[in-house]
Protein backbone atom coordinates (compact mmCIF):
# COMPACT_ATOMS: atom_id res chain seq x y z
CA UNK A 1 0.00 0.00 0.00
CA UNK A 2 1.47 3.33 -1.07
CA UNK A 3 1.78 5.88 1.73
CA UNK A 4 0.90 9.48 0.84
CA UNK A 5 1.33 10.88 4.35
CA UNK A 6 -0.02 14.35 5.01
CA UNK A 7 -0.90 14.74 1.31
CA UNK A 8 -3.80 12.34 1.89
CA UNK A 9 -5.42 15.00 4.09
CA UNK A 10 -5.47 17.72 1.44
CA UNK A 11 -8.29 16.60 -0.92
CA UNK A 12 -11.05 16.23 1.70
CA UNK A 13 -10.01 19.23 3.78
CA UNK A 14 -9.61 21.57 0.81
CA UNK A 15 -12.90 20.38 -0.71
CA UNK A 16 -14.76 20.94 2.56
CA UNK A 17 -13.09 24.32 3.16
CA UNK A 18 -14.01 25.64 -0.28
CA UNK A 19 -17.53 24.18 -0.09
CA UNK A 20 -18.24 26.06 3.14
CA UNK A 21 -16.35 29.19 2.07
CA UNK A 22 -17.76 29.57 -1.45
CA UNK A 23 -21.04 27.60 -1.08
CA UNK A 24 -20.19 26.01 -4.44
CA UNK A 25 -20.36 22.45 -3.19
CA UNK A 26 -20.36 20.76 -6.62
CA UNK A 27 -17.24 22.55 -7.85
CA UNK A 28 -15.50 22.12 -4.49
CA UNK A 29 -16.07 18.37 -4.39
CA UNK A 30 -15.02 17.95 -7.99
CA UNK A 31 -11.83 19.88 -7.25
CA UNK A 32 -11.16 17.68 -4.22
CA UNK A 33 -11.56 14.53 -6.33
CA UNK A 34 -9.27 15.94 -9.01
CA UNK A 35 -6.64 16.93 -6.42
CA UNK A 36 -6.74 13.45 -4.94
CA UNK A 37 -6.07 11.82 -8.29
CA UNK A 38 -3.40 14.40 -9.08
CA UNK A 39 -1.57 13.31 -5.92
CA UNK A 40 -1.94 9.64 -6.86
CA UNK A 41 -0.73 10.31 -10.42
CA UNK A 42 2.33 12.27 -9.21
CA UNK A 43 0.76 15.61 -10.20
CA UNK A 44 0.53 14.71 -13.87
CA UNK A 45 -2.37 16.93 -15.07
CA UNK A 46 -3.29 14.65 -17.98
CA UNK A 47 -3.42 11.33 -16.16
CA UNK A 48 -4.83 13.02 -13.06
CA UNK A 49 -7.73 14.46 -15.05
CA UNK A 50 -8.38 11.20 -16.90
CA UNK A 51 -8.34 9.27 -13.63
CA UNK A 52 -10.82 11.77 -12.17
CA UNK A 53 -13.25 11.15 -15.02
CA UNK A 54 -12.82 7.40 -14.65
CA UNK A 55 -13.39 7.65 -10.89
CA UNK A 56 -16.75 9.34 -11.49
CA UNK A 57 -17.70 6.56 -13.90
CA UNK A 58 -16.53 3.91 -11.44
CA UNK A 59 -18.98 5.18 -8.82
CA UNK A 60 -21.63 3.21 -10.68
CA UNK A 61 -19.57 0.00 -10.58
CA UNK A 62 -20.65 -0.36 -6.97
CA UNK A 63 -24.25 -1.66 -6.94
CA UNK A 64 -24.81 -0.06 -3.55
CA UNK A 65 -23.85 3.37 -4.87
CA UNK A 66 -26.09 2.95 -7.91
CA UNK A 67 -29.05 1.83 -5.85
CA UNK A 68 -28.62 4.76 -3.46
CA UNK A 69 -28.50 7.29 -6.31
CA UNK A 70 -31.57 5.67 -7.92
CA UNK A 71 -33.35 5.88 -4.58
CA UNK A 72 -32.57 9.59 -4.33
CA UNK A 73 -33.93 10.22 -7.83
CA UNK A 74 -37.12 8.21 -7.31
CA UNK A 75 -37.84 10.03 -4.07
CA UNK A 76 -38.64 13.02 -6.28
CA UNK A 77 -41.45 11.08 -7.92
CA UNK A 78 -42.91 10.10 -4.56
CA UNK A 79 -42.78 13.68 -3.27
CA UNK A 80 -44.53 15.06 -6.33
CA UNK A 81 -47.19 12.31 -6.18
CA UNK A 82 -48.21 12.99 -2.59
CA UNK A 83 -48.41 16.72 -3.25
CA UNK A 84 -50.45 16.35 -6.42
CA UNK A 85 -52.84 13.92 -4.69
CA UNK A 86 -53.78 16.43 -2.00
CA UNK A 87 -52.05 14.35 0.65
CA UNK A 88 -49.81 17.21 1.79
CA UNK A 89 -52.73 19.64 2.03
CA UNK A 90 -54.75 17.03 3.90
CA UNK A 91 -51.93 16.35 6.35
CA UNK A 92 -51.52 20.07 7.02
CA UNK A 93 -55.26 20.38 7.68
CA UNK A 94 -55.21 17.36 10.01
CA UNK A 95 -52.21 18.56 12.02
CA UNK A 96 -53.61 22.11 12.11
CA UNK A 97 -56.75 20.75 13.77
CA UNK A 98 -54.66 19.09 16.46
CA UNK A 99 -52.55 22.19 16.97
CA UNK A 100 -55.60 24.43 17.24
CA UNK A 101 -56.58 22.61 20.43
CA UNK A 102 -53.21 23.32 22.05
CA UNK A 103 -53.04 26.85 20.69
CA UNK A 104 -56.24 27.69 22.57
CA UNK A 105 -54.61 26.62 25.81
CA UNK A 106 -51.16 28.11 25.35
CA UNK A 107 -50.16 30.51 22.63
CA UNK A 108 -47.16 29.44 20.61
CA UNK A 109 -47.21 25.79 21.67
CA UNK A 110 -47.96 24.64 18.12
CA UNK A 111 -44.42 25.40 16.97
CA UNK A 112 -43.01 23.36 19.82
CA UNK A 113 -45.38 20.43 19.25
CA UNK A 114 -44.62 20.16 15.52
CA UNK A 115 -40.86 20.23 16.11
CA UNK A 116 -41.12 17.61 18.84
CA UNK A 117 -43.27 15.43 16.58
CA UNK A 118 -40.64 15.69 13.84
CA UNK A 119 -37.91 14.70 16.31
CA UNK A 120 -39.95 11.80 17.68
CA UNK A 121 -40.76 10.55 14.16
CA UNK A 122 -37.08 10.48 13.24
CA UNK A 123 -36.28 8.72 16.50
CA UNK A 124 -38.87 5.98 15.95
CA UNK A 125 -37.83 5.18 12.36
CA UNK A 126 -34.52 3.70 13.47
CA UNK A 127 -34.52 0.90 10.90
CA UNK A 128 -32.69 3.03 8.29
CA UNK A 129 -31.29 6.57 8.53
CA UNK A 130 -32.13 7.43 4.90
CA UNK A 131 -35.80 6.51 5.34
CA UNK A 132 -35.85 8.42 8.63
CA UNK A 133 -34.68 11.75 7.19
CA UNK A 134 -36.88 11.36 4.12
CA UNK A 135 -39.99 10.68 6.20
CA UNK A 136 -39.37 13.58 8.57
CA UNK A 137 -38.72 15.97 5.69
CA UNK A 138 -41.70 14.86 3.61
CA UNK A 139 -44.16 14.86 6.50
CA UNK A 140 -43.17 18.02 8.32
CA UNK A 141 -41.76 20.43 5.73
CA UNK A 142 -45.22 21.80 4.81
CA UNK A 143 -46.07 22.36 8.50
CA UNK A 144 -42.72 24.01 9.22
CA UNK A 145 -43.28 26.32 6.24
CA UNK A 146 -46.78 27.19 7.44
CA UNK A 147 -45.65 27.91 11.00
CA UNK A 148 -42.66 29.97 9.88
CA UNK A 149 -39.94 27.60 11.07
CA UNK A 150 -36.80 27.64 8.95
CA UNK A 151 -36.01 24.71 6.70
CA UNK A 152 -32.54 24.69 8.21
CA UNK A 153 -34.17 23.83 11.55
CA UNK A 154 -36.09 20.97 9.95
CA UNK A 155 -32.91 19.62 8.35
CA UNK A 156 -31.16 19.77 11.73
CA UNK A 157 -33.96 17.89 13.47
CA UNK A 158 -34.14 15.26 10.71
CA UNK A 159 -30.37 14.76 10.59
CA UNK A 160 -29.88 14.68 14.36
CA UNK A 161 -32.60 12.11 14.97
CA UNK A 162 -31.66 9.67 12.19
CA UNK A 163 -28.14 8.28 12.53
CA UNK A 164 -28.07 8.60 16.36
CA UNK A 165 -31.25 6.54 16.74
CA UNK A 166 -30.07 4.03 14.12
CA UNK A 167 -26.85 3.34 16.00
CA UNK A 168 -28.39 3.34 19.49
CA UNK A 169 -31.23 0.97 18.50
CA UNK A 170 -29.08 -1.38 16.41
CA UNK A 171 -31.72 -3.80 15.07
CA UNK A 172 -30.90 -2.72 11.54
CA UNK A 173 -28.10 -2.60 8.99
CA UNK A 174 -26.01 -0.43 11.32
CA UNK A 175 -26.04 -3.10 14.00
CA UNK A 176 -25.22 -5.84 11.50
CA UNK A 177 -22.22 -3.96 10.16
CA UNK A 178 -20.88 -3.19 13.64
CA UNK A 179 -21.32 -6.82 14.73
CA UNK A 180 -19.43 -7.97 11.63
CA UNK A 181 -16.52 -5.70 12.54
CA UNK A 182 -16.53 -6.89 16.15
CA UNK A 183 -16.69 -10.55 15.13
CA UNK A 184 -13.63 -9.99 12.93
CA UNK A 185 -11.80 -8.81 16.08
CA UNK A 186 -12.43 -12.14 17.80
CA UNK A 187 -15.43 -11.36 20.01
CA UNK A 188 -17.40 -14.57 20.59
CA UNK A 189 -20.65 -12.65 21.18
CA UNK A 190 -20.46 -9.47 19.10
CA UNK A 191 -24.12 -8.61 19.79
CA UNK A 192 -23.60 -8.54 23.55
CA UNK A 193 -20.38 -6.57 23.08
CA UNK A 194 -22.17 -4.03 20.92
CA UNK A 195 -25.02 -3.63 23.42
CA UNK A 196 -22.59 -3.12 26.32
CA UNK A 197 -20.75 -0.43 24.36
CA UNK A 198 -23.98 1.46 23.58
CA UNK A 199 -24.20 2.73 27.16
CA UNK A 200 -20.93 4.58 26.52
CA UNK A 201 -21.87 5.92 23.09
CA UNK A 202 -22.18 9.45 24.39
CA UNK A 203 -22.24 11.49 21.19
CA UNK A 204 -25.47 10.09 19.68
CA UNK A 205 -27.11 10.11 23.12
CA UNK A 206 -26.25 13.77 23.70
CA UNK A 207 -27.06 14.75 20.10
CA UNK A 208 -30.52 13.21 20.45
CA UNK A 209 -31.18 14.94 23.78
CA UNK A 210 -30.00 18.36 22.62
CA UNK A 211 -32.75 18.53 19.98
CA UNK A 212 -35.74 18.59 22.39
CA UNK A 213 -33.81 20.88 24.73
CA UNK A 214 -33.32 23.39 21.91
CA UNK A 215 -36.97 23.06 20.88
CA UNK A 216 -38.36 23.53 24.40
CA UNK A 217 -35.86 26.27 25.26
CA UNK A 218 -37.03 28.22 22.24
CA UNK A 219 -33.68 29.86 21.59
CA UNK A 220 -31.16 29.04 18.87
CA UNK A 221 -27.48 29.81 18.52
CA UNK A 222 -25.11 30.84 15.75
CA UNK A 223 -26.26 30.60 12.13
CA UNK A 224 -29.47 28.82 13.18
CA UNK A 225 -30.53 31.87 15.20
CA UNK A 226 -30.02 34.02 12.11
CA UNK A 227 -32.05 31.59 10.00
CA UNK A 228 -34.94 31.62 12.46
CA UNK A 229 -34.79 35.43 12.69
CA UNK A 230 -34.86 35.65 8.88
CA UNK A 231 -38.04 33.60 8.67
CA UNK A 232 -39.71 35.45 11.53
CA UNK A 233 -38.89 38.99 10.41
CA UNK A 234 -38.66 38.65 6.62
CA UNK A 235 -40.81 35.60 5.96
CA UNK A 236 -38.01 33.99 3.92
CA UNK A 237 -37.87 30.22 4.27
CA UNK A 238 -34.48 30.21 2.55
CA UNK A 239 -31.56 32.61 2.69
CA UNK A 240 -30.84 34.90 -0.24
CA UNK A 241 -28.82 33.01 -2.83
CA UNK A 242 -29.66 29.64 -1.29
CA UNK A 243 -29.67 26.62 -3.56
CA UNK A 244 -32.23 24.07 -2.29
CA UNK A 245 -31.28 20.44 -2.81
CA UNK A 246 -34.52 19.82 -4.72
CA UNK A 247 -36.17 21.88 -7.44
CA UNK A 248 -39.02 24.28 -6.65
CA UNK A 249 -41.02 22.24 -9.16
CA UNK A 250 -41.25 19.52 -6.52
CA UNK A 251 -42.05 21.67 -3.48
CA UNK A 252 -44.57 23.94 -5.23
CA UNK A 253 -46.67 21.37 -7.10
CA UNK A 254 -50.36 22.27 -7.02
CA UNK A 255 -53.00 19.82 -5.90
CA UNK A 256 -54.96 18.16 -8.70
CA UNK A 257 -58.23 19.98 -9.53
CA UNK A 258 -61.48 18.84 -7.93
CA UNK A 259 -59.63 16.76 -5.33
CA UNK A 260 -60.54 16.80 -1.65
CA UNK A 261 -57.41 17.00 0.53
CA UNK A 262 -56.97 13.76 2.46
CA UNK A 263 -54.16 13.15 4.93
CA UNK A 264 -54.15 9.42 4.18
CA UNK A 265 -53.06 10.14 0.59
CA UNK A 266 -49.75 11.17 2.14
CA UNK A 267 -49.60 8.98 5.21
CA UNK A 268 -50.31 5.61 3.57
CA UNK A 269 -47.59 5.83 0.84
CA UNK A 270 -45.08 6.94 3.49
CA UNK A 271 -46.10 4.07 5.77
CA UNK A 272 -45.79 1.63 2.87
CA UNK A 273 -42.22 2.81 2.33
CA UNK A 274 -41.37 2.56 6.04
CA UNK A 275 -43.03 -0.88 6.33
CA UNK A 276 -41.23 -2.27 3.27
CA UNK A 277 -37.82 -1.31 4.67
CA UNK A 278 -37.53 -4.07 7.32
CA UNK A 279 -39.33 -6.53 5.04
CA UNK A 280 -36.72 -6.05 2.31
CA UNK A 281 -33.87 -6.07 4.80
CA UNK A 282 -35.11 -9.44 6.05
CA UNK A 283 -35.62 -10.72 2.50
CA UNK A 284 -32.12 -9.79 1.33
CA UNK A 285 -30.57 -11.20 4.51
CA UNK A 286 -32.68 -14.35 4.79
CA UNK A 287 -30.19 -16.61 3.07
CA UNK A 288 -27.47 -15.58 5.50
CA UNK A 289 -29.86 -16.09 8.43
CA UNK A 290 -30.64 -19.66 7.35
CA UNK A 291 -26.94 -20.32 6.94
CA UNK A 292 -25.77 -18.82 10.24
CA UNK A 293 -28.81 -19.57 12.45
CA UNK A 294 -30.35 -22.79 11.04
CA UNK A 295 -31.74 -23.95 14.40
CA UNK A 296 -33.09 -20.60 15.60
CA UNK A 297 -36.78 -19.70 15.74
CA UNK A 298 -38.36 -17.96 12.77
CA UNK A 299 -38.54 -14.73 14.76
CA UNK A 300 -34.85 -14.89 15.69
CA UNK A 301 -33.97 -15.65 12.08
CA UNK A 302 -36.08 -12.69 10.95
CA UNK A 303 -34.30 -10.30 13.34
CA UNK A 304 -30.90 -11.69 12.32
CA UNK A 305 -31.82 -11.39 8.63
CA UNK A 306 -32.71 -7.71 9.07
CA UNK A 307 -29.21 -7.13 10.37
CA UNK A 308 -27.65 -8.98 7.44
CA UNK A 309 -29.77 -7.40 4.69
CA UNK A 310 -28.73 -4.91 2.02
CA UNK A 311 -29.65 -1.39 3.08
CA UNK A 312 -29.32 0.08 -0.42
CA UNK A 313 -31.53 -2.64 -1.92
CA UNK A 314 -34.08 -2.20 0.84
CA UNK A 315 -34.43 1.58 0.45
CA UNK A 316 -34.68 1.31 -3.34
CA UNK A 317 -37.38 -1.38 -3.27
CA UNK A 318 -39.16 0.46 -0.46
CA UNK A 319 -39.51 3.69 -2.46
CA UNK A 320 -40.42 1.77 -5.63
CA UNK A 321 -43.13 -0.10 -3.73
CA UNK A 322 -44.49 3.16 -2.39
CA UNK A 323 -44.56 4.74 -5.87
CA UNK A 324 -46.30 1.73 -7.45
CA UNK A 325 -48.82 1.59 -4.62
CA UNK A 326 -49.47 5.33 -4.98
CA UNK A 327 -50.15 4.95 -8.69
CA UNK A 328 -52.82 2.33 -8.05
CA UNK A 329 -54.16 4.11 -4.97
CA UNK A 330 -54.57 7.47 -6.71
CA UNK A 331 -55.93 5.92 -9.89
CA UNK A 332 -58.67 4.13 -7.94
CA UNK A 333 -59.65 7.51 -6.49
CA UNK A 334 -59.61 9.09 -9.99
CA UNK A 335 -57.09 11.67 -8.80
CA UNK A 336 -54.81 11.26 -11.80
CA UNK A 337 -54.51 9.15 -14.92
CA UNK A 338 -51.68 6.90 -16.08
CA UNK A 339 -50.30 9.46 -18.54
CA UNK A 340 -50.11 12.15 -15.87
CA UNK A 341 -48.42 9.70 -13.49
CA UNK A 342 -45.65 9.03 -16.01
CA UNK A 343 -45.18 12.76 -16.59
CA UNK A 344 -45.05 13.43 -12.84
CA UNK A 345 -42.57 10.59 -12.33
CA UNK A 346 -40.19 12.04 -14.92
CA UNK A 347 -40.69 15.53 -13.51
CA UNK A 348 -39.94 14.30 -10.01
CA UNK A 349 -36.78 12.50 -11.10
CA UNK A 350 -35.56 15.56 -13.01
CA UNK A 351 -36.03 17.66 -9.90
CA UNK A 352 -33.59 15.38 -8.07
CA UNK A 353 -30.77 15.62 -10.60
CA UNK A 354 -28.74 18.04 -8.41
CA UNK A 355 -28.98 15.61 -5.50
CA UNK A 356 -27.99 12.62 -7.65
CA UNK A 357 -24.98 14.56 -8.94
CA UNK A 358 -23.96 15.53 -5.42
CA UNK A 359 -24.24 11.93 -4.24
CA UNK A 360 -22.03 10.80 -7.12
CA UNK A 361 -19.37 13.37 -6.19
CA UNK A 362 -19.60 12.44 -2.49
CA UNK A 363 -19.12 8.75 -3.30
CA UNK A 364 -16.17 9.56 -5.57
CA UNK A 365 -14.29 11.70 -3.06
CA UNK A 366 -15.00 9.15 -0.33
CA UNK A 367 -13.54 6.41 -2.52
CA UNK A 368 -10.36 8.30 -3.38
CA UNK A 369 -9.76 9.19 0.28
CA UNK A 370 -10.53 5.80 1.76
CA UNK A 371 -9.37 3.29 -0.85
CA UNK A 372 -6.57 5.11 -2.65
CA UNK A 373 -5.07 7.82 -0.44
CA UNK A 374 -5.90 5.88 2.77
CA UNK A 375 -6.60 9.11 4.63
CA UNK A 376 -8.19 7.43 7.64
CA UNK A 377 -5.42 4.89 8.09
CA UNK A 378 -2.81 7.65 8.01
CA UNK A 379 -4.61 9.74 10.64
CA UNK A 380 -5.01 6.75 12.94
CA UNK A 381 -1.36 5.76 12.57
CA UNK A 382 -0.16 9.23 13.55
CA UNK A 383 -1.57 9.01 17.07
CA UNK A 384 -1.53 5.32 17.96
CA UNK A 385 2.15 5.18 18.94
CA UNK A 386 1.97 7.66 21.83
CA UNK A 387 -1.31 6.77 23.51
CA UNK A 388 -1.69 6.08 27.24
CA UNK A 389 -4.53 3.85 28.53
CA UNK A 390 -6.49 6.76 29.98
CA UNK A 391 -6.33 8.74 26.76
CA UNK A 392 -7.28 5.90 24.42
CA UNK A 393 -11.08 6.49 24.31
CA UNK A 394 -10.68 10.27 24.11
CA UNK A 395 -8.20 10.19 21.23
CA UNK A 396 -10.01 7.37 19.43
CA UNK A 397 -13.13 9.56 19.49
CA UNK A 398 -11.26 12.59 18.14
CA UNK A 399 -9.58 10.59 15.38
CA UNK A 400 -12.91 9.01 14.44
CA UNK A 401 -14.46 12.48 14.25
CA UNK A 402 -11.73 13.72 11.94
CA UNK A 403 -11.80 10.68 9.66
CA UNK A 404 -15.59 10.78 9.28
CA UNK A 405 -15.50 14.53 8.67
CA UNK A 406 -12.83 14.10 6.01
CA UNK A 407 -14.38 11.13 4.24
CA UNK A 408 -18.09 11.80 4.79
CA UNK A 409 -18.84 8.24 5.86
CA UNK A 410 -19.62 6.93 9.33
CA UNK A 411 -19.58 3.28 8.23
CA UNK A 412 -16.25 3.75 6.50
CA UNK A 413 -14.91 5.27 9.71
CA UNK A 414 -16.18 2.29 11.71
CA UNK A 415 -14.37 0.00 9.27
CA UNK A 416 -11.13 1.90 9.80
CA UNK A 417 -11.32 2.57 13.53
CA UNK A 418 -12.68 -0.67 15.03
CA UNK A 419 -9.73 -2.80 13.78
CA UNK A 420 -7.38 -0.17 15.23
CA UNK A 421 -9.24 0.67 18.45
CA UNK A 422 -9.89 -2.87 19.72
CA UNK A 423 -6.27 -4.17 19.58
CA UNK A 424 -5.05 -0.84 20.95
CA UNK A 425 -7.40 -1.03 23.93
CA UNK A 426 -6.43 -4.65 24.60
CA UNK A 427 -2.71 -3.91 24.36
CA UNK A 428 -2.85 -0.86 26.63
CA UNK A 429 -5.46 -2.37 28.98
CA UNK A 430 -7.97 0.40 28.31
CA UNK A 431 -11.73 -0.01 28.79
CA UNK A 432 -12.72 -2.01 25.71
CA UNK A 433 -16.42 -1.05 25.69
CA UNK A 434 -15.63 2.61 26.20
CA UNK A 435 -13.11 2.48 23.35
CA UNK A 436 -15.52 0.76 20.94
CA UNK A 437 -18.21 3.33 21.77
CA UNK A 438 -15.73 6.16 21.20
CA UNK A 439 -14.88 4.83 17.73
CA UNK A 440 -18.56 4.54 16.83
CA UNK A 441 -19.54 7.90 18.29
CA UNK A 442 -16.68 9.64 16.51
CA UNK A 443 -17.92 8.25 13.21
CA UNK A 444 -21.43 9.57 13.78
CA UNK A 445 -20.17 13.00 14.88
CA UNK A 446 -17.94 13.48 11.86
CA UNK A 447 -20.71 12.25 9.61
CA UNK A 448 -23.04 14.90 11.06
CA UNK A 449 -20.60 17.74 10.48
CA UNK A 450 -19.27 16.82 7.05
CA UNK A 451 -20.77 18.45 3.94
CA UNK A 452 -19.86 15.33 1.95
CA UNK A 453 -21.86 13.00 4.21
CA UNK A 454 -24.69 11.17 2.43
CA UNK A 455 -26.95 11.49 5.48
CA UNK A 456 -26.43 15.26 5.62
CA UNK A 457 -27.06 15.51 1.88
CA UNK A 458 -30.30 13.55 2.20
CA UNK A 459 -31.38 15.72 5.14
CA UNK A 460 -30.89 18.83 3.01
CA UNK A 461 -32.84 17.22 0.19
CA UNK A 462 -35.74 16.07 2.35
CA UNK A 463 -36.01 19.51 3.93
CA UNK A 464 -35.60 21.35 0.60
CA UNK A 465 -32.87 23.57 2.00
CA UNK A 466 -29.44 24.71 0.90
CA UNK A 467 -26.92 22.01 1.77
CA UNK A 468 -24.12 24.25 3.00
CA UNK A 469 -26.59 26.27 5.07
CA UNK A 470 -27.71 23.01 6.68
CA UNK A 471 -24.12 22.12 7.54
CA UNK A 472 -23.40 25.61 8.92
CA UNK A 473 -26.54 25.81 11.06
CA UNK A 474 -26.17 22.27 12.44
CA UNK A 475 -22.46 22.56 13.23
CA UNK A 476 -22.72 24.49 16.55
CA UNK A 477 -25.12 21.93 18.01
CA UNK A 478 -23.00 19.03 16.79
CA UNK A 479 -19.91 20.68 18.29
CA UNK A 480 -21.67 21.06 21.63
CA UNK A 481 -22.58 17.38 21.68
CA UNK A 482 -19.16 16.38 20.39
CA UNK A 483 -17.34 18.55 22.92
CA UNK A 484 -19.39 17.14 25.78
CA UNK A 485 -18.81 13.57 24.57
CA UNK A 486 -15.06 14.16 24.23
CA UNK A 487 -14.88 15.58 27.75
CA UNK A 488 -16.76 12.59 29.17
CA UNK A 489 -14.44 10.15 27.38
CA UNK A 490 -11.43 12.02 28.75
CA UNK A 491 -12.73 12.07 32.33
CA UNK A 492 -13.86 8.43 32.40
CA UNK A 493 -10.66 7.31 30.70
CA UNK A 494 -8.48 9.08 33.26
CA UNK A 495 -10.54 7.80 36.20
CA UNK A 496 -10.49 4.13 35.16
Segments (PLM) and residue ranges:
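Long, contiguous bundles of hydrophobic transmembrane helices that form the permeation core
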Residues: 193, 207-308, 320-343, 462, ...
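Membrane-core helix-loop-helix motifs of multi-pass transport proteins
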Residues: 143-237, 253-265, 456-488, 493-496
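Alpha-helical transmembrane segments and their helix-start/interface "positive-inside/aromatic belt" motifs
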Residues: 9-29, 115-118, 152-160, 164-167, ...
